Amino acid sequence: MTAAHPVAQLTAEAYPKVKRNPNFKVLDSEDLAYFRSILSNDEILNSQAPEELASFNQDWMKKYRGQSNLILLPNSTDKVSKIMKYCNDKKLAVVPQGGNTDLVGASVPVFDEIVLSLRNMNKVRDFDPVSGTFKCDAGVVMRDAHQFLHDHDHIFPLDLPSRNNCQVGGVVSTNAGGLNFLRYGSLHGNVLGLEVVLPNGEIISNINALRKDNTGYDLKQLFIGAEGTIGVVTGVSIVAAAKPKALNAVFFGIENFDTVQKLFVKAKSELSEILSAFEFMDRGSIECTIEYLKDLPFPLENQHNFYVLIETSGSNKRHDDEKLTAFLKDTTDSKLISEGMMAKDKADFDRLWTWRKSVPTACNSYGGMYKYDMSLQLKDLYSVSAAVTERLNAAGLIGDAPKPVVKSCGYGHVGDGNIHLNIAVREFTKQIEDLLEPFVYEYIASKKGSISAEHGIGFHKKGKLHYTRSDIEIRFMKDIKNHYDPNGILNPYKYI
Amino acid sequence: MLRNILVRSTGSNFKFAGRYMKSSALLGYYRRVNYYSTKIQTRLTSENYPDVHRDPRFKKLTSDDLNYFKSILSEQEILRASESEDLSFYNEDWMRKYKGQSKLVLRPKSVEKVSLILNYCNDEKIAVVPQGGNTGLVGGSVPIFDELILSLANLNKIRDFDPVSGILKCDAGVILENANNYVMEQNYMFPLDLGAKGSCHVGGVVATNAGGLRLLRYGSLHGSVLGLEVVMPNGQIVNSMHSMRKDNTGYDLKQLFIGSEGTIGIITGVSILTVPKPKAFNVSYLSVESFEDVQKVFVRARQELSEILSAFEFMDAKSQVLAKSQLKDAAFPLEDEHPFYILIETSGSNKDHDDSKLETFLENVMEEGIVTDGVVAQDETELQNLWKWREMIPEASQANGGVYKYDVSLPLKDLYSLVEATNARLSEAELVGDSPKPVVGAIGYGHVGDGNLHLNVAVREYNKNIEKTLEPFVYEFVSSKHGSVSAEHGLGFQKKNYIGYSKSPEEVKMMKDLKVHYDPNGILNPYKYI
């Protein structure tokens, strides 16, 4: 459950059962003196009034708020190393922070942990246009990475709605998924090397790694998605793809989820190498979005139970148009789809995408929403949304005001088996929460799905790993955490 | 020399089935290799490497141990050494360079039996070597001394396939070609292709993080493998056989087992994402005058062929000279000899579009003079024939008596410099030239998109002088360019001592820590890897 609040309550107050670890030292003047000796003035933010550091203490969703009074913003890996060594020796807890755009409270303090911000490490280190290998500091903002690569006729293999704020290192640390996953795959395949500072200050780097390096265990893989719990990512090497010269999109109306799946199989077969996104939205998602985008004409004439947005990208516009036109005609003639509209130009293309990208904001516009990000086998993908809707209806909670729930919406990335469940509400109530949890997690577990497809675990989903992972897997994970961070100082109270 | 692209005959139609014929032909060549090689008796590894000693911690098998295995396994699941059966098939590696002395091969039919075996061996401190198709090239899957061999060959069932997502779940012992055939019938394709596909197992492919020809298009196994079922050295079964492409819950533990070469766990099941089967294939064979031009053509191919580019292989002149001597009945596709050759494969969903893209690309690079000559396959037979000029190189390199093989990664701009440096060093030592000099020559070929060079030093005989000239020179050279001493083939026994050329001491220590943590008794695939 993620509930959006206008101003975050202190996490320590909202979760009284979570206690500050007495093993962690409380920051004192000697510690400050040490940091001042290795960092310049503009690399230190120190205040006894936490409100002044609110943007570092509060998460993107404004659900969690820590009470750190020290923010360190080192501009080099060596400084990160010194900070970590000192903190490890003194047992000072540290939270690494990038753009702070994650959705599960993974990058903000819970109590008074020191915030280690990577934003001053923002240089592009190297780019090889022959192989497409891109190397940068962890603190490079995604928008800037995209722009740099765009200027060199390449594309970053991942795109996120928060690209204007999130950083490359944070994206890797949280193993973000995003919209390009279907075409370019996961970060586990695209990241070539990482530079990481371990909790004890040691610097581990294989940032010069090549596309093929089959020597030993692939250690970098552990840091991808580790959410800053076993090391601080300070540098990233990633393979960028050639920038597509042609983009196209088509928007479909469909009547049932089985047909969405059939359409996906057909798209994979016929659009194959040019298929770059296959997004589905249910009726509720689009109804919310139609209300939200009042003045934007809906691309289809009628309402349907499901909608699909297909994007293609390739090197030849005429070929791609031919493929997509043939696909649209074939699916229309065979009545696989009820209705379809193909973008005529870039403006059309952007408008079609607006109908997908606006869904989260639209759902949130009635006062708040409960968000779930999950993975399921494709055949079960939509069933969780239907089950939740049925449960809320049975409790008489969905409908017009004054009922608290506006709509239960499901949408997501079909190719990745990833559904986003958004319960749009007018207000947050205990009754809704009790109906949703642990029902949603138990449902996911019963279908052998994952409780977190994209957003990770953070503070929000700590303690819920057993819905997806076996006891032995969880023990293995704890072993790794204990091995690399024996003092437990790095991003405590979270993950596992 | 600018040569017109041959006019395409109308009605030519490539079917993917053609790839089988090519593979079958290739398999035939491999069989010939085996036949030829049996003339040379493989020496015991323990004799060839007297500095490597049997670990005294490991128990020698007793009748009690044998009785235990008999109590949990059926007769067909146990193979013992005897006068008529020396288990050489299991004790010798593919290259016939390493030979162990195992007296016992166990071939369990279920994961539970694998678990019981390992639990027992861990308690008794009996060393174990997991073995799949035994097609590795660095001695990673054969015993060094008398380790017990645990074969996965009997774990060979396809467990599940979802035709909507393309996710295949199978036992580790399924032969790669069988897995590919299975999904092909449902219009999918395995995301990896290997020359050894008729013998290697899916589990072994994952355990060695094999690369192969499709990495350029479909990426590495770290991205394609969705889940694994692994039996730990203590017998515990860890089941992460997920059907989910996205699962961001906790450390991605399966990633450690990919490429771990059976040293921290035995992979018994694999869940992998297969890809839509392409409907159209094209192959072109080109010549260029320098390695810089190879790179230029690659950049253009990435831009213009982009999403349909599925292989970009380069070969140097000498590799084709050697290949010619083996492909006597085949006509060389080009009229003249050139310093470098390129083989480009495209695959896609629409043949007309792909043909058009390839034609435009070739017109452009030839008009600009980057490419000096080239042909495009006109039909399935020609497509297979063009591939032969690439696929025959390993065999051809060995035909004069033997070959020293190096599989390395280097930054693209430095990729070919290793071949030049090696030839210079061999010449300087007066080892290369016509008979009776022992070295025929150092040749280079490989996968440009992956920055992967195969350096083959073709020799008339093996001798210490050549080895000392080559090593550690090759590894030091690779290290100086920040390359990797093993791009595809892994470390195994052969490259165990060379990891330091590619990994820092901190990284090596982290790896050793993991090995000790998961296999504290060190029983699993000892004497190798790290």
Curated annotation (Swiss-Prot), chain A:
Family assignment from sequence similarity: Belongs to the FAD-binding oxidoreductase/transferase type 4 family.
This protein's record includes keyword Phosphoprotein: no
Molecular function (Gene Ontology), one example: FAD binding
Named cofactor requirement(s): FAD
Role description: Catalyzes the reversible oxidation of (R)-2-hydroxyglutarate to 2-oxoglutarate coupled to reduction of pyruvate to (R)-lactate. Can also use oxaloacetate as electron acceptor instead of pyruvate producing (R)-malate.
Domain FAD-binding PCMH-type: 64-243
InterPro entries (alphabetical): FAD-bd_oxidored_4_C, FAD-bd_PCMH, FAD-bd_PCMH-like_sf, FAD-bd_PCMH_sub1, FAD-bd_PCMH_sub2, FAD-linked_Oxase-like_C, FAD-oxidored/transferase_4, Oxid_FAD_bind_N
Sorted UniProt keywords: Cytoplasm, FAD, Flavoprotein, Isopeptide bond, Oxidoreductase, Ubl conjugation
Pfam families with a match to the protein in the record: FAD-oxidase_C, FAD_binding_4
PANTHER family: D-2-HYDROXYGLUTARATE DEHYDROGENASE, MITOCHONDRIAL
Position(s), cross-link Glycyl lysine isopeptide (Lys-Gly) (interchain with G-Cter in ubiquitin): 17
GO cellular-component term (any): mitochondrion
Protein name as it appears in the record: D-2-hydroxyglutarate--pyruvate transhydrogenase DLD3
GO biological process, one term: filamentous growth
Enzyme class: oxidoreductase
Top-level taxon of origin: Eukaryota
Species for this entry: Saccharomyces cerevisiae (strain ATCC 204508 / S288c) (Baker's yeast)
Compartments in which it is found: Cytoplasm
EC number(s) recorded for this UniProt protein: 1.1.99.40, 1.1.2.4
Repeat as UniProt keyword: no
More details: Present with 13000 molecules/cell in log phase SD medium.
Catalytic reactions of this protein: (R)-lactate + 2 Fe(III)-[cytochrome c] = 2 Fe(II)-[cytochrome c] + pyruvate + 2 H(+); (R)-2-hydroxyglutarate + pyruvate = (R)-lactate + 2-oxoglutarate
From Swiss-Prot, chain B:
Keyword entries, A-Z: FAD, Flavoprotein, Mitochondrion, Oxidoreductase, Transit peptide
SUPFAM superfamilies in the record: FAD-binding/transporter-associated domain-like (SSF56176), FAD-linked oxidases, C-terminal domain (SSF55103)
Ribonucleoprotein as UniProt keyword: no
Molecular function via GO: (R)-2-hydroxyglutarate dehydrogenase activity; actin binding; D-lactate dehydrogenase (cytochrome) activity; FAD binding
Domain of life: Eukaryota
Catalytic activity: (R)-lactate + 2 Fe(III)-[cytochrome c] = 2 Fe(II)-[cytochrome c] + pyruvate + 2 H(+); (R)-2-hydroxyglutarate + pyruvate = (R)-lactate + 2-oxoglutarate
GO cellular-component term (any): mitochondrion
Required co-factors: FAD
Protein localization: Mitochondrion matrix
Enzyme class: oxidoreductase
EC number: 1.1.99.40, 1.1.2.4
One Gene Ontology biological process: lactate catabolic process
Record-annotated FAD-binding PCMH-type domain positions: 98-277
Similarity section: Belongs to the FAD-binding oxidoreductase/transferase type 4 family.
SUBUNIT field: Interacts with F-actin.
Additional notes on this entry: Present with 11400 molecules/cell in log phase SD medium.
Job of this protein: Catalyzes the reversible oxidation of (R)-2-hydroxyglutarate to 2-oxoglutarate coupled to reduction of pyruvate to (R)-lactate. Can also use oxaloacetate as electron acceptor instead of pyruvate producing (R)-malate. In addition to its enzymatic role it could play an important role in the yeast cell morphology.
Stated name of the protein: D-2-hydroxyglutarate--pyruvate transhydrogenase DLD2
